[in-house]
């Protein structure tokens, strides 16, 4: 079996370690950073010179790029898919359905990663042939098929992300004010008393992660906004969240 990754960031490099020495893991690092190239080389991943050949020679293609790039990647390389194309990007069901214009529905799996990829996570999947992805379980990758329609997995992911990203934005503002007042330690102490230590650890993790991945978070929030609008609902909280992450990105 040959598993090809389009994009080789945190998600792909972590997943690739489940398959190491068991299947042929491959990617293309054309246009990628030196850091990404070094990681791919260190992990012993087979490197293709271009994405077209990578896709043509993969039994399972996993697209793990940025939300704003997901559709463009499918447009360029979807026609070369011979096996299964798995989109794990945090994009709205609308974007996943747009991808179907470029990839046969029989070959497409809508997939979302729930949890932290470097800790405890699972991949929820939907699509006509989502069950074919269950083969990855024998390598230790937790797969849960939740439906046969494209959009079901990404809908759940959008709802979860609406909660987590909005919570992160609130925490960023709370910690910003506390820092300005010199009351970070006191705030953490009170939060630990009322919410528990696990919540405090979660707060710290979300705040740090928001700065590290601010650009990607912003793109994900734009997808959440589209998701809300598609259901004829007014995005209120998510607009504030979007402004917060735009502010971080511009700092």
Curated annotation (Swiss-Prot):
Q: What is the lineage of its organism?
A: Archaea, Methanobacteriati, Methanobacteriota, Methanomada group, Methanobacteria
Q: Which organism is it from?
A: Methanothermus fervidus
**SUPFAM superfamilies in the record, alphabetically?**
6-phosphogluconate dehydrogenase C-terminal domain-like, NAD(P)-binding Rossmann-fold domains
What protein am I looking at?
A: Uncharacterized 28.5 kDa protein in 7S RNA 5'region
- Where do the TM regions start and end? none
Give the domain of life: Archaea
| One Pfam family from the record | DUF1932
